Amino acid sequence: MAVTANTTTSAQITIQAKEIDLANRFTANWEALTEIMGIMRPIRKAPGTKLVSSKASIDLQDGAVAEGDEVPLSKATVTPVSFKDMVLKKYRKRVTAEAVEKYGAAVAVQKTDDALLNELQGVVLDAFYEFALTGSLTSNEDTFQMAVSMAIGMVKDKFKKMRLNYGQVIVFANTLDVHRYLGATAITTQTSNGVEYLKNFLGADVLIASSEIPAGKVVAIPADNIVLYYVDPADGDFAALGLDYTTGVGDTNLIGVHKEGVYGRASGDTHVLMGMVMWAEYLDAIAVISFGQGG
C-alpha cells in the first residue's frame, strides 16, 4: 500500500533537523527569560569585541543665561570601569550506543540535550551574577524586606540622578533567603526554564531567586541597564576550518550546533559553539545590599 501523501517518515527526521531544534529551543528559552526580565532583544557583536561598563556624570552649568550671552557648556564624563572580551566558547557532549540501547534515544539523547541547554543557560547567568555582585551601590539593612526595598530605591534614585529611564527593576536574591521569607506567607514562586521568579514582589517588578547570589545579599538592577550580547556562530567563516555549525531559524543565532556520529567509539557527539554575555551598561547603577540573617 502506498504511503499517504505528506506523511513524515524517518527520511525527514535528519540530524540537521535535530541540530536546528536544539538551537531553536535554546533561543526560545532565552527569549522567554528576557521577556520575564523585560530585557531588550539580544545585540549581535563581532568576536573579540570589548564590553565596557561605565560610570556617567555631568557637571551641569547654570541655565539662567542672560539674553545674548554665550550658553556655558555642561561637561559630561563617561568613565570606563571594566572590560570583558566577547569570546566564543566550545562545548561537546557524547552519548554511547550502549546508552541508547539501554535507555532509548528519548532518554539518552533528548534528556541529555535538555540538560545541556540548561547548563549553557546557567553559564551565562552565573557569569552575570558574578559581575552584578560588583555593583557599587551598597548598604547594610536589618531584614530581607528592607534590603529589597532599599536596593530598589537606590537604583531608581541613581537612574533619576542620571536623567535616565529605568523601566522595571529586577531584584536577584538567594534562593533560601527568598523561601525563608515566603515561609510565613501564601505566596508561591513561578519557574521558567529552570529560573525561579516572582512578579510584583515587595516592590520589585521581578524578583529572581538564585543559589548563585550569596545568602544575606540582594542585588537590584533596572532592566534598562541590562544588555544581552551575543556572537553569531554564523558570522565566522568556520566552513574554511571544516566546521559546519547549524543555527536556528530566525535572525538571532545564539548558538551553533553540530551533531555527528563517532563510529570509532560507537557514539554520537553534540558540539555547541556559543558566545553570549549579559552585561550592565552602568556598574554604578547596580545595588548590592547586605542584610542580617533571619530577616
Predicted regions and their residues:
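Sequence/fold signature of self-assembling virion shell proteins
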Residues: 43-50, 192-295
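Cleavable N-terminal export/targeting peptides
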Residues: 1-15
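Extended, solvent-exposed, turn-rich assembly/linker loops in the middle of proteins
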Residues: 136-206
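Protein-protein interaction and targeting regions used for scaffolding, dimerization, and localization
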Residues: 8, 12, 81-89, 278-294
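Assembly/oligomerization interface modules of large self-assembling protein complexes
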Residues: 15-89
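Alpha-helix boundary/N-cap detector
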Residues: 17, 21-24, 31, 107, ...
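Long, contiguous amphipathic alpha-helices that act as assembly "spine/axial" helices in icosahedral shell
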Residues: 78-141, 266-276, 280
